[in-house]
């Protein structure tokens, strides 16, 4: 028996170490091969880079990125920019701007292990340790989390702060610590709310509702203690103080952003009109949950009916077991369940367009927590429970395997023989171009006309005083990456493939070849 226990603990330790080591390499180390500084239709990373440099000049943002994909005339609060700002003290390199995301993603792995351990009450110690480590390792392999935390993007830190959000609420509901500690926890609860509403439109709309419901439940549970009932007001105060710059802007602008948000939520035509049919809305909420498996947990280059079926079986079994057998911490699971239900209600109103995986980021932990809780409370002395457990383990293994495959592809695009051009590679090439030369950039148009990637790199890093233009006159220089990222801008985002680039249809002289690119001079 003792040897069996030692094996379980040893396996738990190995899984925990693997989770943290893999997360450290993918979320921290590989950031410095930064290949996503300029991807997609919008140059968000470049715009953010300029904004952080402006902050060093004393220009502090009062509003954040556009909400709702920039289609509805409102923005989210600006705290993401303030989260990313401190690490830019190390330099203007874009890698330091994304390092904050990498750190939060890395820290979310041990935090998830701790969270799951707290969740699995009434489970024997060794099993609890093993399943907590399994949850951490599983999440460390999630390709979608790896990808979005390897470039500068506001939604990326949501998983970390959701864990903090839930753990703080559990502390408030269950602690016997002195009132001072409870007051401090409520202050941090409010700051966490302020951060979460500053990361994405979904959190901006859903987290305040969750926090109000949670606070009202806290007040109800402590209704005989007047002083404790006043504690949630500390979170309201701290949240609004954290959002001081945003509220200052709103007051000065006569609440223009709030009015834009209200218009987006109420005006017909701002989005597809939601169905009033209860069955239709319920089906959409269920479908978007099941389809999350195809987007985050069971990956394929194309939409896969097989993966959708696997996801449906997986969710069905997990939900059935948790509803029937769960005996863990009710505060944590209840808090998350409220958030998930509010999100699912909101998703049933979502217009019929691409529902990208990052827009479902509040659900990302749900499959992991449901599956791990299911394994924790199955009675493995019963044949039926053993069969269910085996099915779940096989599906979890399949999820880890498919994600590791896409992790490997992403790593190969950074370190393989056929790889993308990184910021560091670009700097090395630009340093070979004579000072004051003209650099041809065909992408410098539309949203990139003002600020393209070469503009930023030369202004703040290489300082070669280049003239960057999309006109490409004779005598100008042209950098041709050997490969580009062909990313799927649909429900399968951020899956991508490498595509060979085509040379300019101009006579050119080759000056330099690196493993990632060519440098030409246009004749």
Where are these regions (language model features)?
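Membrane-proximal, lumen/periplasm-facing interface regions of secretory-pathway glyco-
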Residues: 34-37, 69, 389-432, 441-462
């Amino acid at each position: 028996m003792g040897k069996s226990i030692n094996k379980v603990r040893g396996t738990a330790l190995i899984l925990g170490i693997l989770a943290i080591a893999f997360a450290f390499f993918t979320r921290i180390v590989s950031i410095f091969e930064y290949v996503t500084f300029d991807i997609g239709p919008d140059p968000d990373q470049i715009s953010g880079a300029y904004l952080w440099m402006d902050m060093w000049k004393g220009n502090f943002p009062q509003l954040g990125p556009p909400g709702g994909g920039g289609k509805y005339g409102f923005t989210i609060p600006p705290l993401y920019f303030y989260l990313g700002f401190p690490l830019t003290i190390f330099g203007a390199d874009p890698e330091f701007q994304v390092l904050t995301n990498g750190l939060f993603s890395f820290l979310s792995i041990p935090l998830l292990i701790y969270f799951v351990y707290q969740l699995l009450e009434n489970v024997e110690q060794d099993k609890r340790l093993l399943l907590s480590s399994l949850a951490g390792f599983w999440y460390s392999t999630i390709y979608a989390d790896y990808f979005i935390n390897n470039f500068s993007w506001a939604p990326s830190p949501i998983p970390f702060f959701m864990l903090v959000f839930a753990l703080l609420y559990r502390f408030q509901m269950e602690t016997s610590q002195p009132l001072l500690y409870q007051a401090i926890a409520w202050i941090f609860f409010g700051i966490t709310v302020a951060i979460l509403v500053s990361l994405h439109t979904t959190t901006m709309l859903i987290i305040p509702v969750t926090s109000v419901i949670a606070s009202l439940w806290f007040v109800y549970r402590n209704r005989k203690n007047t002083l404790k009932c006043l504690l949630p007001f500390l979170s309201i105060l701290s949240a609004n103080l954290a959002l001081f710059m945003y509220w200052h802007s709103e007051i000065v602008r006569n609440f223009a952003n709030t009015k834009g948000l209200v218009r987006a939520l109420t005006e017909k035509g701002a989005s597809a009109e939601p169905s009033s049919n209860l069955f239709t809305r319920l089906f959409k909420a269920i479908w978007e949950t099941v389809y999350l498996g195809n987007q985050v947990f069971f990956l394929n280059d194309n939409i896969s009916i097989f993966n959708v079926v696997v996801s449906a079986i997986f969710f069905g079994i997990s939900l059935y077991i948790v509803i029937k057998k769960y005996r863990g911490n009710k505060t944590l699971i209840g808090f998350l369940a409220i958030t998930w239900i509010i999100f699912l209600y909101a998703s049933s109103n979502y217009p019929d367009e691409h529902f990208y995986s990052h827009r479902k980021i509040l659900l990302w932990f749900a499959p992991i927590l449901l599956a791990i809780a299911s394994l924790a409370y199955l009675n493995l002395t019963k044949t039926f429970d053993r069969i269910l457990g085996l099915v779940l383990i096989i599906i979890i293994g399949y999820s880890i395997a498919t994600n590791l495959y896409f992790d490997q592809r992403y790593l190969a695009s950074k370190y393989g023989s056929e790889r993308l051009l990184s910021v560091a590679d670009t700097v090395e090439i630009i340093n070979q171009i004579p000072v004051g030369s003209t650099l041809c950039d065909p992408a410098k148009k539309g949203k990139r006309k003002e600020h393209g990637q070469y503009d930023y790199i030369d202004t703040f890093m290489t300082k070669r005083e280049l003239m960057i233009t999309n006109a490409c006159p004779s005598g100008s220089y042209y950098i041709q990456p050997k490969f580009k990222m062909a990313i799927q801008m649909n429900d399968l985002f951020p899956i991508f493939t490498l595509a060979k680039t085509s040379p300019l249809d101009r006579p050119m002289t080759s000056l330099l070849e690196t493993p990632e690119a060519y440098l030409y001079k246009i004749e």
